[in-house]
Amino acid sequence: MKVLKPGLLTTVQDIGRTGYQKYGVLASGAMDTVSLRIANLLIGNGENEAGLEITMMGPGPSFHFSKQTLIAVTGADFTLRINDEEAPLWKPVLIKENSTVSFGPCKLGSRAYLAAAGGIEVPAVMESKSTYVRGSIGGLHGRALQKEDELNIGEMSALSQTILSRLSSQLGKQGFAAPKWSVSRGRFLPLKKNPVIRVLEGKQFAFFTEESKTRFYEEAFRVTPQSDRMGYRLKGEPLELKAPLEMVSEAVSFGTVQVPPDGNPIILLADRQTTGGYPRIAHIISADLPIVSQIMPGEHVQFEPVSLQEAEALAVEREQHIKELKTRMKMEWLT
């Protein structure tokens, strides 16, 4: 595949560079890992296969595929076109050779994921193909995609070959073929503007004033333009500590909510540092991380406390849905 237009920020990502944070190496990986995993499953790839993460702000990217290719596109709600024909999201799509795939205006969300059967072929760095642009690590030459870049696609699995073969018989004058069914976005990614995000109390929650603790759950914080894959900087009435707090830097995770001295929270994301020295007021539950990853700058976000038991139940429920999808895919194409 060849990049015709790269868009604002398009990078190669998989689930992330796990196991190396103890050495100070960032995890990176897809912001919305659920959407990438599902895109891969829809076309017979392994869940962690590398795909493209496309930031849907400004003009969208476009790609040329020289060979017949099986793809799936998930994530944000936007218009996908194949050779100027509107094409479906959240389902396997077989495109003809010499086809152009274009990403149009985004209606809701901020990131799309394109997976190709066989996966995007780039060298693995520390067991991951994910791109960390600031460190020039992984992906294609450690950077975002540029116009005229060419990407190779790997060998297809047996399941991918079966899906491609079945859809090939449906190719007609239209530039693509797809099954009638699709995965429900709402089941895996319930997008909503200005979402309410569920959190667990952070280690230093008790060190904030009672007024600030109440405000944290009642205020709608604005996501500022100074937000990126490293973290979302929020703006609202500053949160205050009861007394100055000196901290030793500790490990942080995807979804940690830190409060720097200016009192405006920061949500740490995929390209977060491995440690942080600011008070941690909360941690976003894993079930809501995909929703957070789809928030656009300018939107507002509110926080809602939940129990650890509820957070665990929601995480288990999501993984069960993904397991059911894997089973359904095999039954759909192999029986």
From Swiss-Prot:
Enzyme Commission identifier(s): 3.5.2.9
Record's catalysed reaction(s): 5-oxo-L-proline + ATP + 2 H2O = L-glutamate + ADP + phosphate + H(+)
GO terms of biological process kind: sporulation resulting in formation of a cellular spore
Induction data: Induced by glucose when readily available sources of nitrogen, such as ammonia or glutamine, are scarce. Transcriptionally activated by TnrA and repressed by KipR.
InterPro entries, per database record: CT_A_B, Cyclophilin-like_dom_sf, PxpC
Superkingdom, taxonomy of origin: Bacteria
Coiled-coil zones: none
Enzyme class: hydrolase
Subunit structure: Forms a complex composed of PxpA, PxpB and PxpC. Interacts with PxpB.
Protein name as annotated: 5-oxoprolinase subunit C
Organism (species): Bacillus subtilis (strain 168)
